[in-house]
Amino acid sequence: MADLGSGTPQLRKLGIVPGARWSVIGADPGWRFETTPDAAAEVSGSAPADVVLVFVRAAAELEPALVEQEQRVFPAGALWIAWPRKAAGHVSDLGDSVVRDAALARRLVDVKVAALDHDWSALKLVWRREHR
């Protein structure tokens, strides 16, 4: 998938570096990283991870996704929540403010927003320092 905007490689943008444990949840069939994560380990289920990327398509999916995935990145990992980009013509009741508000209510804070590709934007969430 082509990177938009910054020119930063997609994996680096997401924090998936050699040695990282990562997981992708809910991606569309055929969605993939623009390059293969070298020397990083994909983990599944509820296994702890350094980076979890969750694709959500509607606001109703957001809270369950946060509840299911937030502990996987505790205390120092990153939970990326991706939603369909309205700029690409997608219709969705999600956006950065909806994701941010839901995250703050769960003791998570947003630290970065990124365009993953033409179809998806994402917000990077981490645990607030006082809750680590």
Residue spans for each PLM region:
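Short acidic low-complexity segments
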Residues: A39-A49
